């Protein structure tokens, strides 16, 4: 990104992956629907095959369980929980792959944001994700819960620099097709949905 100078970017990347490891990332509100444990299970399989690091960005009710799973797998040194972050584009700009194994996604905006930063996406085929993530081009789609399939696709993208670059370029190109005129209504829909759910919850509490 223009705000994040190349020298800063390389320094940041070197700090997180000192030996040139591939960097995978996940961003969410750490709720059950995000299937955060699947993120870790996918990464575990990737990590067995190649040097890699995982950045877990965000916070929520499933974070503690995710951290406990990391400890049980002895992967604390390779998985970093960064909490909520304001400069998302800066963090995404150093990632090589974005993992989104959600049970459901209305629009897949986090996947779109990753692609806009040039990060290919490994996701499920849930909800609106197939419209955002083009299978075999900007990343890959897998059935919900199929961590083996997701890991296989991840390794396919990460196996060599040329393949990774092809997916990165395609991700940026596809993200650009989502102009503001298309994105703003999606955000408005999302806010309307959240607001409606909140009002419904409040009415049930009364």
Language-model segment annotations:
Residues 180-206:
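C-terminal alpha-helical cap of glycosyltransferases
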Residues 18-34, 40-43:
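Conserved donor-binding/catalytic core segment of Leloir-type glycosyltransferases
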């Amino acid at each position: 990104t223009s705000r994040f100078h190349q020298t800063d970017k390389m320094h940041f990347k070197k700090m997180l992956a000192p030996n040139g490891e591939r960097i995978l990332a996940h961003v969410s509100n750490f709720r059950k629907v995000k299937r955060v444990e699947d993120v870790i299970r996918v990464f575990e399989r990737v990590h067995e095959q190649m040097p890699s690091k995982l950045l877990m960005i965000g916070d929520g009710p499933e974070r503690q369980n995710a951290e406990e799973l990391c400890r049980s797998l002895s992967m604390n040194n390779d998985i970093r929980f960064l909490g909520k972050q304001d400069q998302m584009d800066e963090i995404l700009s150093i990632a090589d792959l974005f993992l989104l194994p959600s049970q459901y996604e209305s629009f897949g905006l986090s996947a779109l944001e990753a692609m806009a930063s040039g990060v290919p996406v490994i996701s499920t085929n849930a909800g609106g994700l197939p419209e955002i993530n083009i299978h075999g081009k900007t990343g890959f789609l897998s059935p919900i819960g199929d961590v083996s399939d997701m890991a296989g696709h991840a390794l396919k993208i990460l196996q060599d620099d040329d393949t990774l670059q092809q997916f990165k370029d395609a991700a940026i190109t596809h993200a650009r097709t989502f102009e503001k005129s298309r994105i703003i209504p999606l955000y408005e829909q999302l806010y309307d949905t959240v607001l409606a759910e909140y009002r419904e919850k409040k009415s049930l509490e009364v």
